Swiss-Prot record:
The keyword Nucleotide-binding does not apply. CDD domains: beta-trefoil_Ricin_BinAB (cd23429). Component of a binary toxin active against Culex and some Aedes mosquito larvae. The individual subunits are not toxic. BinAB binds to the gastric caecum and posterior midgut of C.quinquefasciatus larvae; this subunit alone binds the entire larval gut. Binary toxin internalization into host gut cells requires both proteins. Toxic to Aedes atropalpus mosquito larvae; mortality towards both C.quinquefasciatus and A.atropalpus is maximal by 48 hours. A.aegypti is not very susceptible to this toxin. GO terms for molecular function: toxin activity. Processed by proteases in the mosquito gut, probably at both the N- and C-termini. Residues 156-370 are annotated as: Pore-forming domain. Forms a heterodimer with BinB. Changing S104A: No change in toxicity against C.quinquefasciatus, slightly higher toxicity against A.aegypti larvae, protein is more like BinA from strain 2362. Keywords: Disulfide bond, Sporulation, Toxin, Virulence. It comes from Lysinibacillus sphaericus (Bacillus sphaericus). This is Binary larvicide subunit BinA. Disulfide bonds join C31-C47. GO terms for biological process: sporulation resulting in formation of a cellular spore. It comes from the Bacteria.
Length: 370
C-alpha cells in the first residue's frame, strides 16, 4: 500500500482522530454545533459532546485533506464567506490544504493560500465565545487563522490482505475432464477507502466510530466459458461473454462511487475522484481513458480442431472481481462485482501436446445493458 502519511509531523495521518483547537482560545476545540444551529456551523466553544470535537483528516492524492467529524461524518465545507459542516459530496469546496506557520500551528485554505479560514467570534472584532470559521485574506500577523492539533485518539486501520501471484491457467487431467468452473482466485491488490465515500446500511455516524476506513479488494481468476470434446477436424461454434452486467455496474457505482470503463479501466465519481491515483496504484488497475462504460457482450466464435485425433478443449476468460470490506474484514457487497475481460482468454486442452483450435468467425449476438 502507498504511504499516506503527511510530511510534517504535526499534521495528522489517516490513523488518528484529532481534536483541533483554536490557537487564540487554546482551551476550546472546534466543535460541530447542535443540529438546530443554522448551516451546520463549526464553532469554537465549550462542547459537551466529545465525538463532536474529534475529526479525521482523510488524505487525497494531491496532499489535500477532507476533514470529517467523528460524530456524524459531516465534513468541513466552504461557503461564500464561511466554513460549515455538511454531508460529503466530493465538492471542491470540501478539500482543504494545510499550510504550516510554526512547528505546532498551521492554517487551512481551500485553494488559494492567501485566503485562509479565520476563527472569529460571531460579533466582528471580538474574541468572545462562541466563534466560528470564516474566510479571510488577512494572513500576515493574524493569529485568528492559526490552529493546532492537541489530543489524538488512535484508530486501528484495516489489515489489508497480502498480494498474490496472478492466477494459474487450469490444466485438464483427461479427455473427459472439463476443468474447474473457476480457477483458484488470486488477490491482485487492495486499498483503503474512507467510510464517507462508500454505501453501507450502517449509519455514517456509526461508521465513523467503528470502521472509518473500509477496503476494496481486487481478485482475479479464470472463468470457464465452455468445454467440449472435438472430434478430429471438427468445427464447433461456442457462445462466450465479456464485460460486466448492468446490475453489477450499477451496484459497484452505488457501493464505492467507482465504475468500469469500456476499456476495462476504472471511472471515478465525484466522491472518489480525489483518491483515484492511489486507488488504482494499490489495486493494480488503471484509470479509464474513455467516457463509455463497460457493458456485457455476448458473442459466438467458431473453433476448429486441426488435429487428426479427438481433443478436449475448455475455454477460459480472465475475471476481475471487486469486493468492499469493513475494517473487521466482513464483506459489504454479498455479490462481488465481476468483469470478464476477453482481451485475456486461454484454452485448456487434453492431450496437452495438442495444438490450440483454429479460431474462425466471431459474431456479436448482444451488445447491450440487459
Amino acid at each position: 500500500m502507498r504511504n499516506l502519511d503527511f510530511i510534517d509531523s504535526f499534521i495528522p495521518t489517516e490513523g488518528k482522530y484529532i481534536r483541533v483547537m483554536d490557537f487564540y482560545n487554546s482551551e476550546y476545540p472546534f466543535c460541530i454545533h447542535a443540529p438546530s444551529a443554522p448551516n451546520g456551523d463549526i464553532m469554537t466553544e465549550i462542547c459537551s459532546r466529545e465525538n463532536n470535537q474529534y475529526f479525521i483528516f482523510f488524505p487525497t492524492d494531491d496532499g489535500r485533506v477532507i476533514i470529517a467529524n467523528r460524530h456524524n461524518g459531516s465534513v468541513f465545507t466552504g461557503e461564500a464567506t464561511s466554513v460549515v459542516s455538511d454531508i460529503y459530496t466530493g465538492s471542491p469546496l470540501q478539500f482543504f490544504r494545510e499550510f504550516k506557520r510554526t512547528m505546532s500551528t498551521y492554517y487551512l485554505a481551500i485553494q488559494n493560500p492567501e485566503s485562509a479560514t479565520d476563527v472569529r467570534a460571531l460579533e466582528p472584532n471580538s474574541h468572545e465565545l462562541p466563534s466560528r470559521l470564516y474566510f479571510t485574506n488577512n494572513i500576515e500577523n493574524n493569529s485568528n487563522i492559526l490552529i493546532s492539533n492537541k489530543e489524538q485518539i488512535y484508530l486501528t486501520l484495516p489489515s489489508l490482505p497480502e498480494n498474490e501471484q496472478y492466477p494459474k491457467t487450469p490444466v485438464l487431467s483427461g479427455i473427459d475432464d472439463i476443468g474447474p468452473n473457476q480457477s483458484e482466485k488470486s488477490i491482485i491488490g487492495s486499498t483503503l477507502i474512507p467510510c464517507i465515500m462508500v454505501s453501507d446500511f450502517i449509519s455514517l455516524g456509526e461508521r465513523m466510530k467503528t470502521t472509518p476506513y473500509y477496503y476494496v479488494k481486487h481478485t482475479q481468476y479464470w472463468q470457464s466459458m465452455w468445454s467440449a470434446l472435438f472430434p478430429p477436424g471438427s468445427k464447433e461454434t461456442k457462445t462466450e461473454k465479456s464485460g460486466i452486467t448492468d446490475t453489477s455496474q450499477i451496484s459497484m457505482t452505488d457501493g464505492i462511487n467507482v465504475s468500469i470503463g469500456a476499456d476495462f479501466g476504472l471511472k471515478f465519481g465525484n466522491k472518489t475522484f480525489g483518491i483515484k491515483g492511489g486507488f488504482t496504484y494499490d489495486t493494480k488497475t488503471q484509470i479509464t481513458n474513455t467516457s463509455q462504460l463497460l457493458i456485457e457482450t455476448t458473442y459466438t466464435r467458431e473453433y476448429t480442431n486441426t488435429e487428426n485425433f479427438p481433443v478436449r478443449y475448455t475455454g477460459y476468460v480472465l475475471a476481475s472481481e471487486f469486493t468492499l470490506h469493513r475494517s473487521d474484514g466482513t464483506q459489504v457487497n454479498t455479490i462481488p462485482w465481476v468483469a470478464l475481460n476477453d482481451n485475456y482468454t486461454t484454452i485448456a486442452r487434453y492431450p496437452h501436446f495438442a495444438s490450440e483450435p483454429l479460431l474462425g468467425n466471431t459474431k456479436i449476438i448482444t451488445d447491450d445493458q440487459n
